[in-house]
Amino acid sequence: MGRIFLTGEKANSVLKRYPRANGLFEEIRQGNIERECKEEVCTFEEAREAFENNEKTKEFWNTYTKAQQGESNRGSDWFQFYLTFPLIFGLFIILLVIFLIWRCFLRNKTRRQTVTESHIPFPQHLNIITTPPPPDEVFDNSGLSPGFLEYVVGRSDSVSTRLSNCDPPPTYEEATGQMNLRRSETEPHLDPPPEYEDIINSNSASAIAMVPVATTIK
């Protein structure tokens, strides 16, 4: 028999319980089968080994199974909440980040548009329509009449439109207004040419009028 069964000391030396990671807490608060079965999932055999009595084991097992069923029912009610709440919270954070990024992008875009609009120069070929001045203010501070200013503006507009239409630039005569004078000078005379006798008479008269000059050589 001694070879088949071990004594108590030898059995405890072989079959012993190793301490857990919270061994210090277990030394302060000694555990029991009820607390261990509530904290962990235990079986009927483990409870019978702990109580070593069938009546106490059955009584404990009935209360333990009822408590486990109640806790499982309460846990199933909260399971959906524990599952959906993190998803809803994460989706809200993602939407908030997307909204902030879109807001910053829109603000930067509006700032760029305002800066570019402020730097765009005013086109020079556009005319500004203003009300006519009163008759007292016929001349401005520079001494130029409004008619002269309108003439200058109209000429600049014609030149700008000609340049925009890819026409060649105006000549010097067109720019200075001397085109009509040059045309009048180049036009042929309408008088008939002089006759041959008139040319001879004019040449003879000029020869008689000339006085000879005598030179002396010493």
Swiss-Prot record:
Residues 1-20 form a propeptide. It comes from the Eukaryota. It is a single-pass type I membrane protein. Residues 182-192 have a biased composition (Basic and acidic residues). SMART domains: GLA. It holds the Pfam family Gla. Gla residues are produced after subsequent post-translational modifications of glutamate by a vitamin K-dependent gamma-carboxylase. GO terms for cellular component: extracellular space; membrane. Residues 160-192 are annotated as: Disordered. Residues 20-66 form the Gla domain. GO terms for biological process: blood coagulation. It is found in: Membrane. This is Transmembrane gamma-carboxyglutamic acid protein 1. It comes from Bos taurus. The lineage of its organism: Eukaryota, Metazoa, Chordata, Craniata, Vertebrata. The gene is PRRG1.
